[in-house]
């Protein structure tokens, strides 16, 4: 069997797939948009400035990490001062961002752990050897694979094309529909 962790914008799904079917699935309505929102909330509460969704996403991409990383640097952030209404610059550190997003990241990691706990024992050996596969844009958060690996003791492999993995898989299913047809017919809705 294979274990896939898909972290999208609004949801995170972890599934174990074996012999053309889903063995176990754990899905939560938490994703990378929630990480962005947590950054916005933190900057508003701790620094008194409002930032937009795009700025929060830029912060996540530039200095966001799920675990401490070597050679971390802060970033200059520009927003609107909540008191004066004027533009204001602040310096934001990676430690602050990690603190801001920790609750969201923990929910994602806990979801992976719950899915792992439902895996039949005979399949556990597969994951210990091959590991889990991380896909989706949310999986690009630096240090996330390492944090999942640390908290589950199972290797995590990043898809070489995490943003395209889901659509490529769907395309593969369409191209090979006749071969995979029995899997689709047996799928639960």
Where are the regions that the model predicts?
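Glycine-rich phosphate-binding loops at beta-strand->alpha-helix junctions
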Residues: 68, 124-148
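Gly/Thr-rich phosphate-binding beta-strand-loop-beta motif of the actin/hexokinase/Hsp70
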Residues: 1-22, 71, 142
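Phosphate-binding glycine-rich/basic clefts of nucleotide- and phosphate-handling proteins
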Residues: 19-102
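Short, surface-exposed connector motifs at secondary-structure boundaries
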Residues: 21-23, 125-130, 152-155
